[in-house]
Amino acid sequence: IDDVIRFAPASRQTLLFSATWPEAIAAISGRVQRDPLAIEIDSTDALPPIEQQFYETSSKGKIPLLQRLLSLHQPSSCVVFCNTKKDCQSVCDVLNEVGQSALSLHGDLEQRDRDQTLVRFANGSARVLVATDVAARGLDIKSLELVVNFELAWDPEVHVHRIGRTARAGNSGLAISFCAPEEAQRANI
């Protein structure tokens, strides 16, 4: 952002939009905007029609549960979120081994490969995209039927970003979260 601002004229209108407003975004706003007008929407007013389901399972039970849910729901498009690049690739590999068409999207991929993965997913070459949070930032898929949190997010705002990938453009969506005993504290259980 700073590189872009450096090339912008001194006299300009700068608009900044964010679904959440963590300290990092507030700091950017302070650097690039003068006397900004903040418009906040009450989070309950902004909620899209997302059905959330929660499944308690062991860590080893997550893959079989994911397979059962993909077979049950038969989504034409689904994003599965993992917390690490290693888990992301591992889940993708297992899904492909059992005949699910899956692609992985994480930070170890070159930008060219990430772009190619997104194009392949968008054109329906694969039904499942297994992704890390960072790689999926800004991901906008118009008709994403299902989001699965294979692992619970460390931060509640990340959870909101994840499930917000579904239920876009007036569509409803389904978000499923898995929780192993070691993740229970993050689920406020």
Regions found by a protein language model. Give the residues of each.
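Conserved helicase RecA-like core
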Residues: I1-I189
